Design a protein with these regions (language model features):
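Short alpha-helical hairpin
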Residues: 26-34, 54-62
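Loop-to-helix transition at the N-terminal end of transmembrane alpha-helices
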Residues: 36-51
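Hydrophobic membrane-insertion alpha-helices, especially the h-region
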Residues: 50-61, 214-222
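Structured inter-helical modules in multipass membrane proteins
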Residues: 86-175
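Alpha-helical transmembrane anchor segments
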Residues: 2-33, 173-254
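Transmembrane signal-anchor/signal-peptide helices with a preference for the extracytoplasmic
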Residues: 57-77, 230
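Short extracytoplasmic/periplasmic juxtamembrane "stem" segments immediately C-terminal to an N-terminal membrane anchor
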Residues: 76-93, 240-254
Length: 254
């Protein structure tokens, strides 16, 4: 299911087909047994309640997706600030250790920029492995001076490095924070039920075929937008590493 949700265009296509078929099935039921006028009022009430519930669930999912997007963007900025702060605090270390820390931070920054820009899964695994090793090296680079000279000044550099490593963990957690699968399942189930009811309850008219497309298109576009915003790498809407890239240009003088 995660694979599908990471491809918003596939979500759009599948939901449009499924919802249109649901309305068509509802319309076929109506041909077998048409609604009586005495039943139509109660049926309209049920259909309206179902569509209202669908709207509420879509709004809830959209709110979650936007919240996750904003969280990922905030943690990208926090990562850049933490790396910049530690890069400056490296001057507090002995000259040899400071040079090593700055070199490692530059490499680490490059990997974080690649993490945000890369879409290839195999390349991402390489980036993750390299980043994990760099985190170990970065901590070792400040651990040695801290053990040798446990002064308040050195402690500032250690604290800054701790912020760098923690900011990466916070960013990862934000990327994993997605709209839950059960919420998607509930939305799909209610949408299918709603479209079945619409197909069953729609009266015969010349424009019936066109009307049958309206709700599936609207709901499918909503699903597409939620999936696009919620997927960190899929679709059209991504988190550009603006702050990390700006920091990289500043450090490298580009």
């Amino acid at each position: 299911m995660n694979y599908v949700l990471n491809l918003p265009l596939l979500v759009l296509t599948l939901s449009l087909v499924a919802l249109w078929l649901s309305e068509a099935i509802g319309a076929s039921f109506r041909k077998r047994r048409n609604l009586q006028e005495s039943e139509r009022e109660g049926f309209s009430l049920v259909a309206a309640a179902t569509l209202t519930l669908l709207g509420l669930i879509i709004g809830f999912a959209f709110s979650m997706a936007i919240s996750g997007y904003d969280q990922r963007r905030s943690y990208e900025e926090a990562e850049a600030n933490a790396i910049a702060t530690e890069y400056n605090r490296s001057d507090l270390l002995p000259a040899e250790d400071a040079a090593r820390v700055r070199a490692l931070l530059r490499n680490y920054l490059d990997q974080r920029v690649l993490f945000y820009e890369t879409r290839d899964e195999r390349e991402l695994r390489k980036i993750d492995a390299t980043t994990t090793q760099l985190k170990t090296d970065l901590w070792s680079a400040v651990q040695g001076p801290a053990v040798a000279r446990p002064t308040p000044v050195i402690a500032l550099a250690v604290s800054g490095m701790n912020d760098v490593l923690n900011s990466k963990g916070n960013a990862d957690a934000a990327w994993w924070n997605r709209v839950p699968g059960p919420a998607w399942g509930l939305m799909a189930a209610i949408a299918i039920c709603g479209n079945l009811l619409i197909g069953y309850g729609l009266r015969n008219s010349e424009g019936r075929a066109t009307l049958l497309l309206v709700l599936p298109v609207v709901v499918s576009i909503s699903f597409f937008l939620i999936s696009d915003i919620d997927s960190p790498r899929g679709g059209l809407i991504h988190i550009p590493p603006q702050n990390l890239t700006s920091l990289s240009r500043s450090i490298y003088g580009r």
